[in-house]
């Protein structure tokens, strides 16, 4: 495409042949005047080539970004290593667990990369590797694995797994099969089912994979790839050793031509083409003379060549095709074989003709040799039993069949049946009325699709509603019982279902009472446990108890009577622990009314681990792309989040002077641990408690001066604002302004347009599915705020008879603020703005977007309880990967087995953790990466590398107290420094310094609280006066779920070192999965939460400032 265009006038039109097809087409479109100016022509063509190259590079970049985000990073790696093009059929086989609609977006982008690779574009995608994840990009296929040492993706299945164990190293004297590297595996590795499935694809797309024991090939074998058995003639050595071009290497044209010539010697005659020149000699001889070009009718009927009409003298198919023959009988089986299905539909799809000129290597497509070498050939007597005479076969068609149309039902029956068994393939719709195989016997794999038994194929995709009327004469259902044992089978299946139901009720009894007991866990108060003494103090400390909460007063009332933001703390009698106000909002009635109640098959987003959520986001992006590309008219290669941004903001804005309005949600998470400021939560609570009956809430405007005063109150006192006696319309307008002033829309800049497209183009039947996928792709803080707002608006709609605010009315009022519609963007040029609004009325695009936003928000308000569930389809498609992403919480007995020491117990494991903490402190915590923090704290992290994407965080601070007092504050007085601390109890005391401890942390309403069950131990007799507290999650039978979600503490260690003058240095190392958050959220916010925690512990020791003048002592 980028051939040089002559610029000399003498060249004229003689250089037309040197142009690319695009250049020739452009040249022919020009008039004669333009053609007479070669210099002008050359400039036009050069500019066209440059623009085309830039467009192709952008498409390639978008495709690679999408591949990584959707769970296909291995293909992006191969493209960046200049190892494209690749075979699309092999990619489909690697992802055979995906639906056809989900594979199409992947194939579309791989075809784009194949096209870009054929154009020889420069591949210089320097992807900056950030610290957002401990692992490389996630791959959804279990046939690929990531090598941490080489930082590369490679195939799990190697090619040698296709061969029997005795043939993997080759026969004596033959050349053994060479090892394949990770870069070659995508082009040369095929598992056994993949080789078979290349030749068997159904028209419907859902059954595109054949069974492992079935390979529908009767055509002569053509070699399009290197042979893998030493008993076969070997291709030239340089073909085997030239799978790809190395990166940045440009092979010469002569080398490419010679390579193609060698490929031609290996390629047989295809179904639609022949070799040029019949007198060619020196080619690779595979077998004796054989029919290469069969009539189309022979291929369609799967006919078998019988020399001289004698079936007995005909050689087995393997021998006819030049494969080594074996003397095994049909009753013997190779160890590598799998049992074949008893039913198989005839393979009528003829073999495709694939081009051999593939850059960088070859794929083992159409290679039936692999299936044949691993199989024994049957004897002559079994061949006689295998094939019946063609005269004994009768093909039936329905009586109402119209000539020229495809029949709705076909039957191939034998006039002399020797079988008595019946079989039904429910997956393919094929009914076999054939013989029963002898146990241990099976048909050869190459002929598995040619069963000569009675067969009926019913096609449910043929137009017509009288299928059974058409096949009634064929099957005669009233006379013959086709399925004599079907009732017994169904009865047996129903019995198994009852057994499974009984078992599930015994294992999960809470599922029976889920509807009646919803909301009760987490609300029950703890019984007062016995007083627990610390061995280093000898006196009792405050007993475990439940802090005062809204639960003790009112559970179901919508009108909470608690004074906003003020709660009493129980005084422990210690000077620094005097009564402190708790400013964290506890909104239990809102939390209860919208507590998630998903079905057992549809888990909630808030219960997913970080690894599970990352996996679900890959499948959500894949499903959302498939839906949008099917319905939308936008770009087919990438979405708004995939477009490369050439202009980046160099300086991160500073939000120190802002507290509530105009601050990103993630900054609120870093400051307070919750994405919504406390004052905004209090505003929603005030509206929900006192103002839901106000007519036209969010529709009627408030007074600007009072709204401005409310904004100032929020900025000055973001933790506590009293909204009593405030106008409902003023507070509602202030809430709308909060969302309007966010730096980006609530639906984010990346996905706002996608949400609008869903309600513009996607059909109503698929909108919920598309919105669920898009919500999974939202940032965690945006998704949590969206859920809180939608649940609140749903409460407003429930009183529509009083406030007259329907879902559509609310959506019309709030959609512009949530989507940032009709707002002039800063990056828009003044000329564009002036042209757009010169007419004084919005254009049609703006009207469509406003309508889609209103309809979408109204739909989300009504479906707020279902939007945040994980679709069952995503969990089913992820297969074992979803289960493996769950964090296994060990029991006390399992902790000892994690150490290599014999006879190790959980005490040994805990002592091992304490010794490791002391060693790191002695080495000054080497290998940790420091990052910025606030409030005079030190923050650092370290990647673990155990397969979990979460990092290990470390926060340090100096405390004005000795180590023993600090340990007691962390161990027994958490309610003094953690405002989210709701409930706690000691489940079991193992010894004086070890216990099973359970506690609950509150979350922003209506999100569920987090329940923790940890094994913890503490030491006070360490060298240099140090104290430690180590804890981790364990499974305990007596620890019932008290909160909404059971969180997992993978590691939590407190190290308290004396600093002199009664001071200590507190270091907290933790790694916790709170559930419901993605790895990106932990990277952006969790470290700041750890730093804020140690700062609160430090601040709990600071004495209260007494009022009055300072006195001298």
UniProtKB/Swiss-Prot annotation:
A Pfam entry, by short name: SAM_2
Polar residues biased stretches: 177-188, 536-549
Record site feature (Arginine finger), residues: 699
GO cellular component, one term: mitochondrial membrane
UniProt region (Disordered), positions on chain: 162-254, 307-346, 536-580
Domain SAM as annotated: residue spans: 55-122
Domain (START): residue spans on this chain: 899-1107
Domain annotation Rho-GAP: ranges: 663-868
Membrane topology: Peripheral membrane protein
Role description: GTPase-activating protein for RhoA, and perhaps for Cdc42. May be involved in regulation of cytoskeletal reorganization, cell proliferation and cell motility. Acts a tumor suppressor in hepatocellular carcinoma cells.
Subunit structure: Homodimer. Interacts with TAX1BP1.
Protein name per Swiss-Prot or TrEMBL: StAR-related lipid transfer protein 13
Organism, as annotated: Homo sapiens
Name of the gene: STARD13
């Amino acid at each position: 495409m980028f051939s040089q265009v002559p610029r000399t006038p003498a060249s004229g039109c003689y250089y037309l042949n040197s142009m690319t097809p695009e250049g020739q087409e452009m040249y022919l479109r020009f008039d004669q005047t333009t053609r007479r100016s070669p210099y002008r022509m050359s400039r036009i063509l050069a500019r066209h080539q440059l623009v085309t190259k830039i467009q192709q590079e952008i498409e390639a970049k978008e495709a690679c970004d999408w591949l990584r985000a959707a769970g296909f990073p291995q293909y992006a790696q191969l493209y960046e290593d200049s190892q494209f093009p690749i075979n699309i059929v092999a990619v489909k086989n690697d992802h055979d667990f995906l639906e056809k609609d989900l594979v199409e977006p992947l194939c579309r982008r791989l075809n784009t990369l194949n096209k870009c690779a054929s154009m020889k574009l420069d591949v210089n995608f320097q992807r900056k590797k950030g610290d957002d994840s401990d692992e490389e990009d996630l791959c959804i296929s279990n046939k690929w694995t990531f090598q941490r040492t080489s930082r590369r993706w490679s195939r799990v299945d190697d090619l040698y797994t296709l061969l029997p164990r005795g043939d993997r190293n080759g026969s004596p004297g033959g050349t053994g099969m060479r090892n394949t590297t990770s870069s070659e595996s995508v082009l040369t590795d095929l598992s056994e089912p993949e080789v078979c499935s290349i030749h068997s694809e159904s028209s419907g797309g859902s059954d595109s994979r054949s069974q492992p024991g079935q390979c529908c090939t009767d055509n002569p074998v053509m070699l399009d790839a290197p042979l893998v058995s030493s008993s076969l003639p070997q291709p030239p050595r340089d073909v085997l050793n030239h799978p790809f071009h190395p990166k940045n290497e440009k092979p010469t044209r002569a080398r490419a031509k010679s390579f193609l010539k060698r490929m031609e010697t290996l390629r047989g005659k295809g179904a639609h083409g022949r070799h040029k020149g019949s007198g060619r000699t020196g080619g690779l001889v595979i077998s004796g003379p054989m029919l290469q070009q069969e009539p189309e009718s022979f291929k369609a009927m799967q006919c078998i060549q019988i020399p001289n009409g004698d079936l007995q003298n005909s050689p087995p198919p393997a021998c006819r095709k030049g494969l080594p023959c074996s003397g095994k009988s049909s009753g013997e089986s190779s160890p590598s074989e799998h049992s074949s299905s008893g039913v198989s539909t005839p393979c009528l799809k003829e073999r495709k003709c694939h081009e051999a000129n593939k850059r960088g290597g070859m794929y083992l497509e159409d290679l039936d040799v692999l299936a044949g070498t691993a199989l024994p050939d049957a004897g002559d007597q079994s061949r006689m039993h295998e094939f019946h005479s063609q005269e004994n076969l009768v093909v039936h068609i329905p009586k109402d069949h119209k000539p020229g149309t495809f029949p709705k039902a076909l039957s191939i029956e034998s006039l002399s049946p020797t079988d008595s068994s019946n079989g039904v393939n429910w997956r393919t719709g094929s009914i076999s009325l054939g013989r029963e195989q002898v146990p241990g016997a099976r048909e050869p794999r190459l002929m598995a699709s040619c069963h000569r038994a009675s067969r009926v194929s019913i096609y449910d995709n043929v137009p017509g509603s009288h299928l059974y009327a058409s096949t009634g004469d064929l099957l005669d259902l009233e006379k013959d019982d086709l399925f004599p044992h079907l009732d017994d089978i169904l009865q047996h299946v129903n019995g198994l279902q009852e057994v499974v139901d009984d078992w599930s009720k015994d294992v999960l009894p809470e599922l029976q009472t889920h509807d009646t007991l919803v909301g009760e866990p987490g609300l029950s108060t703890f019984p007062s446990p016995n007083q627990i003494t610390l061995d280093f103090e000898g006196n009792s400390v405050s007993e475990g108890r439940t802090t005062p909460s809204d639960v003790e007063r009112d559970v179901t009332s919508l009108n909470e009577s608690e004074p906003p933001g003020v709660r009493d703390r129980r005084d422990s009698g210690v000077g620094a622990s005097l009564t402190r106000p708790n400013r964290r909002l506890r909104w239990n009635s809102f939390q209860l009314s919208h507590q998630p109640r998903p079905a057992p098959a549809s888990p909630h987003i808030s219960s997913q681990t970080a690894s599970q959520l990352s996996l679900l986001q890959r499948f959500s992006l894949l499903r959302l792309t498939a839906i949008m590309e099917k319905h939308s008219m936008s770009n087919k290669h990438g979405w708004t989040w995939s477009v490369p941004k050439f202009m980046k903001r160099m300086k991160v804005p500073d939000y120190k002077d802002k507290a509530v309005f105009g601050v990103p949600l993630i900054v609120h998470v870093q400051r307070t641990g919750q994405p919504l400021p406390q004052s905004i939560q209090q505003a929603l609570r005030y509206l929900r408690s006192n103002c839901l009956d106000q007519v036209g809430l969010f529709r009627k405007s408030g007074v600007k001066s009072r709204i401005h005063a409310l904004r100032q109150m929020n900025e000055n006192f973001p933790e506590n604002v009293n909204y009593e006696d405030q106008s409902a319309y003023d507070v509602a307008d202030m809430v709308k302004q909060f969302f309007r002033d966010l730096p980006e829309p609530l639906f984010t800049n990346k996905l706002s347009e996608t949400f609008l497209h869903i309600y513009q183009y996607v059909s109503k039947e698929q909108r919920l599915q598309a919105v669920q996928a898009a919500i999974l792709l939202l940032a965690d803080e945006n998704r949590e705020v969206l859920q809180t707002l939608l649940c609140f608006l749903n409460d407003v709609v429930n009183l529509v008879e009083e406030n007259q605010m329907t879902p559509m009315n609310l959506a019309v009022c709030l959609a512009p603020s949530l989507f940032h519609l009709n707002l002039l963007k800063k990056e828009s040029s003044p000329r564009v703005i002036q042209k757009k609004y010169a007419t004084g009325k919005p254009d049609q695009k703006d009207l469509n977007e406003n309508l889609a936003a209103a309809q979408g928000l109204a739909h989300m308000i009504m479906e707020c309880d279902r939007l945040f569930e994980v679709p069952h389809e995503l969990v089913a498609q992820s297969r074992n990967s979803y289960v493996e992403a769950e964090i296994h919480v060990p029991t006390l007995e399992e902790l000892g087995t994690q150490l290599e020491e014999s006879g190790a117990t959980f005490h040994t494991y805990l002592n091992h953790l304490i010794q490791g903490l002391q060693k790191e402190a002695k080495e000054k915590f080497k290998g940790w990466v420091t990052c910025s923090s606030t409030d005079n704290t030190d923050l650092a992290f370290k990647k673990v590398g155990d397969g979990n994407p979460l990092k290990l965080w470390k926060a340090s601070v100096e405390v004005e107290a000795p180590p023993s007092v600090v340990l007691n504050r962390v161990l027994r007085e958490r309610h003094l420094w953690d405002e989210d601390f709701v409930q706690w109890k000691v489940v079991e005391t193992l010894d004086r310094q070890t216990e099973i401890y359970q506690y609950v942390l509150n979350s922003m309403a209506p999100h569920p609280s987090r329940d923790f069950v940890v094994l913890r131990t503490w030491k006070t007799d360490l060298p240099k006066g140090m104290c430690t507290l180590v804890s981790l999650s364990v499974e305990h039978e007596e620890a019932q779920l008290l909160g909404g979600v059971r969180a997992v503490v993978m590691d939590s260690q407190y190290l308290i070192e004396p600093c002199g003058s009664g001071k200590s240095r507190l270091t907290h190392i933790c790694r916790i999965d709170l559930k419901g958050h993605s790895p990106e959220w932990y990277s952006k916010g969790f470290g700041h939460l750890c730093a804020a925690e140690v700062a609160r512990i430090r601040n709990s020791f600071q004495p209260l400032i007494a009022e009055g003048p300072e006195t001298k002592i």
